A protein has these predicted regions:
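Conserved glycine-rich FAD pyrophosphate-binding loop
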Residues: 46, 53, 108-109, 273-414
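Residue-level signal for inorganic ion chemistry
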Residues: 33, 81, 249, 342
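Short, conserved charged micro-motifs
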Residues: 85-86, 207-212, 256-263, 315-321, ...
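N-terminal accessory segments
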Residues: 1-38, 43, 50, 273, ...
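N-terminal glycine-rich flavin-associated loop
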Residues: 2-29, 52, 59-112, 122, ...
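C-terminal substrate-binding/cap subdomain adjacent to the FAD-binding core in PCMH-type
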Residues: 123, 142-298
Length: 414
């Protein structure tokens, strides 16, 4: 896609005109802000493959900037193309944070850390390791302003969580991957940031035992905010001194109360062996590595086919044996076992056949998989929610027909 194929509206009227014009010309638009997640969704890959002659980039970078931030009211409103780094900076200055811990996946696609936007995070419903305790990005969206595929401006939600005005469109658009409407402005709920954090970890646990430990810790009274399992091949990248697996549990909170909770948790874990402790700075560095999937953004792993598998935690340990069958492949678990990151060497032969095995494995475990980094021809097949049944697919088609009947933003179902 050349620069001449890009459309960059700077206000609402220009955006509406661009969409209406595309409908009239039977053209298609690929929405992006900083282009930091190019190839993330099935919709983009299908557009790139099939419609290159009539495809234009809809550059939303003109809709940026924080126009409302009231720390005392715990709300922030910003343009969809506002960089997450700018938002994080303002929140940190006021000891606040987005509770769902938005990850930074730009380096996974060769980009610079901090290059993502608020619109990209919300469009993809990207949630970090704290999701298991604080909820997803979707749960923190208060309001959205957007233009549909019909060229119609609409606003939904407001400045409070309670919604009595009708359909909760902000939650619907969150995770829609830019296939229903072009978001221009987003209002978010923010919360006070934790004063400090610490991580307790156990070494050399087998995957099935690790999942049990994580499940028990997350359901305990110690307020564990994140839980992950790192096989030895992954653990050594962030802690070079180790040659064992790591099962990591994070606690956050007030400086006065956190040490007591940490000690209680460590006593609770004694039956599984001696635990070790990472203090605040080391703990934050470790969880950035985990939440941003940095293992797959550096070295030989940068070219891996990359999957996110959403699995029932009770079944997620089965991925260990499955990965051994694949050959050169790597994984780790986040969300207490609910999310598995799986990277498969780009040198693997019969890539499509391997991807079919991965998708089938996820279904067998009662979950589903999404291919988030691969050649377009593979993402176009495996980058969507293939586990949906006929009823769910029909419902999604009805929603898409209401917002974007001409398929301006996506000719295929995500």
């Amino acid at each position: 896609m050349s620069a001449s194929d890009s459309i960059r509206p700077v206000d609402m009227e220009e955006l509406r005109a661009a969409i209406v014009s595309s409908v009239e010309r039977d053209a298609h638009l690929r929405i992006h802000g900083m282009n930091s997640k190019r190839g993330w969704s099935r919709a983009w890959c299908a557009l790139a493959q099939c419609l290159s002659k009539n495809l234009h980039a809809l550059d939303m970078s003109g809709f940026d900037g924080i126009d409302l931030y009231e720390p005392e009211e715990l709300i922030l409103r910003a343009g969809a193309a506002t960089r997450m780094s700018e938002i994080q900076k303002h929140l940190q200055e006021n000891q606040q944070a987005l509770s769902f811990e938005p990850p930074d996946f730009a380096p996974l696609y060769g980009g610079t850390a901090g290059g993502g936007t608020l619109g990209g995070v919300i469009a993809c419903n990207l949630s970090g390791s704290r999701r298991v305790r604080a909820g997803a990005a979707r749960d923190c969206v208060l309001g959205i302003e957007a233009v549909s595929g019909r060229g119609e401006l609409f606003r939904s939600g407001g400045r409070v969580m309670k919604n009595v005005t009708g359909y909760d469109l902000p939650k619907l658009l969150t995770g829609s991957h830019g296939t229903l409407a072009a978001m221009t402005q987003i209002t978010m709920k923010v919360l006070p940031a934790s004063e400090t954090s610490a991580s307790v970890f156990l070494s050399n646990l087998k995957p099935d035992i690790a999942v049990v430990v994580m499940t028990q810790a997350l359901s305990s009274a110690y307020e564990v905010s994140a839980a992950a399992y790192l096989p030895a091949s992954v653990a050594t990248q962030v802690m070079p001194a180790t040659t064992n697996t790591l099962t990591v549990l994070r606690l956050e909170g007030a400086e006065k109360s956190l040490p007591a909770r940490v000690e209680l948790l460590r006593k609770h874990l004694m039956e599984h062996g001696d635990s070790e402790l990472l203090q605040d700075d080391e703990s934050r560095a470790l969880w950035s590595f985990i939440g941003d999937a940095r293992f797959f953004a550096s070295g030989d792993r940068r070219e891996d086919l990359l999957w996110r598998l959403f699995l029932p935690p009770s079944q997620s340990h089965n991925i260990d044996a499955f990965v051994r069958q694949l050959g050169e492949a790597y994984y780790f678990l986040d969300w207490g076992g609910g999310l598995a990151w799986l990277g498969i060497s780009n040198e693997t032969k019969e890539k499509r056949a391997v991807c079919e095995k991965v998708a089938a494995f996820a279904l067998e475990q009662g979950g589903y998989g999404v291919l988030v980094r691969a050649p377009d021809e593979l993402c176009g097949v495996f980058g969507g929610f293939s586990a949906l049944g006929a009823l769910e697919n029909a419902l999604m088609e009805r929603v898409r027909a209401a917002f974007d009947p001409d398929g301006v933003f996506s000719p295929v179902q995500v």
